[in-house]
Amino acid sequence: MVVAVLIGGAEAPGRSSSIRGAEGCRMGFPRVMPPVPPTLRASAALLVLCAVARLGGAPDTPAVLVSVSWEKTLIVSRTTPTLQVVVNPMLRPGSPIHDGALAALKAIHARYVRYVPWFPYPRLVVPELEPPSSAGTSWDFSLIDPMTTDFLEATRGEPTVMNFSTIPAWMFRTERPVAYPADPNGLAWDYVQGTELRDPSCREVGDYFARIVEWYTAGGFTDENGRRHSSGLHYEIPIWEVLNEVDFEHATTPRQYTERYDAIVAAVHRVSPKTQFMGLGLGAPSDDADLVEYFLDPSHHRPGAPIDYISYHFYATPAAAESPDTWQFTFFDQADRFLATVRYIEAIRKRLSPATRTDTNEIGSILPGDPGSLTGPPPSIPDRYWNAAGASFAYVFANLARQGIDIVGESQLVGYPSQFPTVTLVDWRNGKPNARYWVLKLLVDHFHPGDRLVETKAEGGDVFAQGFATPSGRSLLLVNRRNTPETVTLPAPGAVLETVDGATGEDAPRSETLGSDTVRLAPFAVATASWR
């Protein structure tokens, strides 16, 4: 229980923008108190915002009561849960976790997995690192193909989103050539430089990406000098995403991005006519309404340029001094602000380009110091973090499903020290999936487009609940948003309960058949209850 402190006969606020742990204060002291001088009242208010934290599981704590109105449909789901795979050295053949990570990707059977060869490792993501000349070209896929074909084989039979997100540095006007490490595993955080393309028509950048697509779909391509390069590869690319986080990279303006998007789309469409296209990939969508508005306006595009999808990202980011006791507020408060941003972007999309679909393809959390100061094994990541991060993702997924978002992608398959270790779904030390992965697998296994989201209430605590009517029966998603246990009363006796919590660790969800209507959710637990 949380105590709201009364100062001088007035109830102190139960929430503070600077002290997050006070959210949810409900139980107050009696209001009959002696007067307190104003100076003491102000001092006391600074000292005691919340005197007692919630005591989950205390005998006098009432159970959270979940009720579901199965006949009241909120929305028919359009939402697919999935993940992204970001290229880094841990995915290379020979890596100690290569096989484990690939097995985890195959086992999840997710649709619309996003594949992103991203700029920090230029030799692993840019197949033409030097500009062409009359003497020849630098096209070389030898380091890139092994990881890319691993991905395409692991996801064979499912639609994917491909995004070779990095424009070669030499295509931009810079004071001097941009250097990159000789070591393929070497980091180059400064590889992205310049703001203006050396070819303002954007034909050069469009042709570059078209050749990459031809390499993987048409068996090869002809380079700038007329020489044929053969790959023997004939994969399909259902969706091509055009660049990534352009609001952070190259100081890209809305007009610049739209011109580059149109040029790339036109070039790729010529060589892969069935491919659909995804735009924006915004890193900070709440700050980029002007970019969204400009890009979604068809009048700013070439005639006939398709805008099949837009995409954008969200990461919860607690402050350095925070702990699990404050993450429980920070993660979900920031998630709610992101959900408000989504509603705003949806209003723009529906007004300007209603046929365009949405992929929120990087959802996660990042702890302070990641990646910059976490260059070695980071003992500062407590096990409970993975549960908190998983709970946050499940909460965001369900609320995005309520808004009709098409794809919700968790970030990312593999991170490790120096490359966002707190974002990983697979333990970089042993290749085993962590709690974030198992939460995603619960969602992939249980919730699909076509399910009905129905009116669901959870009263008396901090558990989030959402009922889904599915072709196989009824399913209930439960998320404990707090760092304390919660007792929950469900309308589901005899249901099969699958749970990810601190006790499951890096193992698969625990499964049990309920013998009563009451369940106990550990801190940051995520569970599904399913029955016919």
Predicted regions and their residues:
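Intrinsic, low-complexity polybasic segments
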Residues: G8-P13, S18, E23, G28, ...
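Bacterial N-terminal signal peptides that target proteins for export
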Residues: P30-A44
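Bacterial N-terminal signal peptides
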Residues: S43-R54
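Non-catalytic accessory regions flanking glycosidase/transglycosidase catalytic cores in CAZymes
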Residues: R54-V242, F248-E249, T253-P285, H301-P306, ...
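Catalytic-core regions of glycoside hydrolase
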Residues: V271, V292-Y309, R337-L352
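Substrate-binding cleft/loops of secretory-pathway carbohydrate-active enzymes
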Residues: L282-S311, I363-A388, P417-Q419
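Glycoside hydrolase catalytic-domain groove-lining segments
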Residues: T317-L374
